[in-house]
Amino acid sequence: MTFRDRIHPQLRDWYDASAGFDFDHLETFVPKCNEAELANLKEDPQVVTYDRTIPGPAGSPDVKIRVYAPQDRESSALPCLFFYHGGGFLFGTVYRQEALCQRYVKHVGCVVVSVEYRLAPQWKMPAPLEDCYAALPWAHENHEELGIDPQRRAVAGL
């Protein structure tokens, strides 16, 4: 059975239009995408970026987050944007929308917390969603360290 055979019939036209995307060999395709994302990272001198590991959901692995903050802060308590990268919970990394997260920091004046959630098919739902949620209470409890206002939070993703 191919990947196409497992797709709902109403979505097969979309699949057929996705020529060049090797759905049947995700185990090799996904690492290539991740390598390409890492190779294209560009630092922005106006944005401080660092990685952290936070406690995962109960009984689950810890979760990696990537934090983006303004180099020159105007406040010690900025709004926080929780950002979830695209990829349909199947592929992608926190690096996928690095430039977009940097733009949010510069143009919105916020701190961005991007979550490296677990991916399918290695992890079944609701594991990715649980990882995404784990960042919310963690950031609330650690708002002073992050320099965020716990009352001004938003969620975004692609």
Go through each PLM region and give its residues.
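Serine-hydrolase catalytic-loop signature spanning alpha/beta hydrolases and amidase-signature enzymes
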Residues: F83, G88-F91, Y95-R96, V112, ...
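Short amphipathic alpha-helix adjacent to the substrate-entry channel of hydrolases
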Residues: Y95-V115
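Short beta-to-alpha linker loops that shape the active-site pocket of alpha/beta-hydrolase fold enzymes
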Residues: Q71, E116-A120
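Gly/Ser-rich "nucleophile elbow"/oxyanion-hole loop immediately N-terminal to the catalytic nucleophile
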Residues: H140-A156
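Gly/Ser-rich catalytic serine loop of serine hydrolases
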Residues: W123-P126, R153-L158
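Alpha/beta-hydrolase active-site loop
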Residues: W123-E145
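A glycine/proline-hinged amphipathic helix-loop "lid/cap" segment
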Residues: M1-V67
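Short beta-strand element of the alpha/beta-hydrolase
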Residues: I65, A77-G87
